[in-house]
Amino acid sequence: MTDKHNKKYVVALDQGTTSSRAIVFDRDANVVSQAQREFAQFYPQAGWVEHDPMEIWATQSSTLVEALAQASIEHDQVAAIGITNQRETTVVWDRHSGRPIHNAIVWQCRRSAAICAQLKRDGLEDYIRETTGLVTDPYFSGTKLKWILDNVEGARERARNGDLLFGTIDTWLIWKLTEGKVHVTDYTNASRTMLFNIHSRDWDARMLEVLDIPRSMLPEVRNSSEVYGNARIGGVGGGELPIAGIAGDQQAALFGQMCVEPGQAKNTYGTGCFLLMHTGDKAVKSTHGLLTTIACGPRGEVGYALEGAVFNGGSTVQWLRDELKVINDSFDSEYFATKVKDSNGVYLVPAFTGLGAPYWDPYARGAVFGLTRGVKADHLIRATLESIAYQTRDVLDAMQRDAGERLRALRVDGGAVANNFLMQFQADILGTRVERPVMRETTALGAAYLAGLACGFWSSLDELKSKAVIERVFEPECDEPRREKLYAGWKKAVERTRGWDDGEL
């Protein structure tokens, strides 16, 4: 790009589960402006979740225009657009009209559970894990796509005739931004569909046959950092902007944290927790209940990671606030937790919806252990925060065993990282330093970095690493005997919650 030195900004489109955002970054990776719009959630039946793809497009395209207008930025000052998105959510549309044939089926939606059960009965569970790196679960796109083709009248015939297209949200947005000229996805999003062979890096013929999905529906799969096409944008003067970066939200956060080498890991502390550890160019098969997924290498090329999800993180603090009403605000939890020197032997296991990685026990249920008359609300609040750190260690221990890599440091992002007590206890229970960055918008930043590298806005990974400023490092302050004693108590508590809901209570 001949005029790249005249460009001042990169825009990240961050399409999430509840809102669409656009964030403008300057050359120093500072946020210049941002816009956000929420959209409707639809729950047609228990366990079903849908979005309107046209509303996603409307909110995302308007935030792009708003963010540029907010800072009086003209399109010719923007080097590129990067896209990061909620993963697995599935859209099917008519290639001629551009209209979706059904609402988007969201990653949380469980409607394809019966399809997954049939895949297991057919003995495909091991094949799916070996080939795609995933577990056989409705979470992923493949069975959602099959459900749409099976349940929308005429969809199967239209798909076989080449009239329908499939995409995750990144693909849908790029199709709309390029006015139907470009039908692509990146390797990180493709690896979440349960249709993609992460070793050959191509759509898997056997999975397509099993689920009866025509290959003609599927997008071209490209690297996470390259120019895919030009976005037509509205606003003053209109214009075109190159779309030059794509990554699923968790992989984008991993790249935004500059975790691009084996053993580097990040944890996003949100409602739940998402942990990813980079494993370099090696797809590590997990024997400890983790997913093997594609991540971004140093220049946006294919790398691999292990991924584990904790179901209840920040949601556990919300439970203290909303149901038990022992705090008025989530931020208060740090104050009360530090009023006592320890949890007084109390362990809270927040298995409200079962346990995620590495246990994968849907029948576990939440419990509090170690209650005595000496236990106060402050102890329970402290035990609740500690449970987030313990669950994180569960996943990281599994990652280190699978990868044969020692965790160098844990990089953190998400809302709960503002809690200094939690971050310090996390370092203590891991025996590893925890690094909290100045820039908290790591997901959007990752998408911006990928786009900026592709178009020459940033020249190298070293340049990006120089911008990754750590606001605070939490060093372990707990000696090993105490650390292991505390963690042994947690493991004992978790074991007592396993298999609790046997259907007889």
Swiss-Prot record:
Disulphides: none
Modes of activity regulation: Inhibited by fructose 1,6-bisphosphate (FBP).
Domain of life, per lineage: Bacteria
Residue sites binding ATP per the record: 17-19, 271, 314, 318, 415
Pathway in which the depicted protein is active: Polyol metabolism; glycerol degradation via glycerol kinase pathway; sn-glycerol 3-phosphate from glycerol: step 1/1
E.C. designation(s): 2.7.1.30
Gene Ontology terms for molecular function: ATP binding; glycerol kinase activity
Pfam (any one): FGGY_N
Reaction(s) this enzyme catalyzes, per UniProt: glycerol + ATP = sn-glycerol 3-phosphate + ADP + H(+)
InterPro entries: ATPase_NBD, Carb_kinase_FGGY, Carb_kinase_FGGY_CS, FGGY_C, FGGY_N, Glycerol_kin
Keyword 4Fe-4S on entry: no
Enzyme class, UniProt record, top EC level: transferase
GO CC list: cytosol
Biological process (GO), any one: glycerol metabolic process
HAMAP family linked to this entry: Glycerol_kin (MF_00186)
Protein name (Swiss-Prot/TrEMBL): Glycerol kinase 2
Species assigned in the record: Pseudomonas aeruginosa (strain ATCC 15692 / DSM 22644 / CIP 104116 / JCM 14847 / LMG 12228 / 1C / PRS 101 / PAO1)
